Amino acid sequence: KISTGFTPFAGNGFTXITEYGP
């Protein structure tokens, strides 16, 4: 599982805490 609380790449829609994958 990958958890992000930031925008990893410009243009992606990640702006919050996102969890995905194993």
UniProtKB/Swiss-Prot annotation:
Keyword Plastid listed: yes
GO cellular component, one term: chloroplast thylakoid membrane
Subcellular location: Plastid, Chloroplast thylakoid membrane
Keyword Nucleotide-binding: no
Inducing stimuli: By light.
BP terms from Gene Ontology: photosynthesis
Key words, A-Z: Chloroplast, Membrane, Photosynthesis, Photosystem II, Plastid, Thylakoid
Function recorded in the entry: May be involved in the regulation of photosystem II.
Family designation: Belongs to the PsbP family.
Protein name: Oxygen-evolving enhancer protein 2
Organism of provenance: Physcomitrium patens
Source organism phylogeny: Eukaryota, Viridiplantae, Streptophyta, Embryophyta, Bryophyta
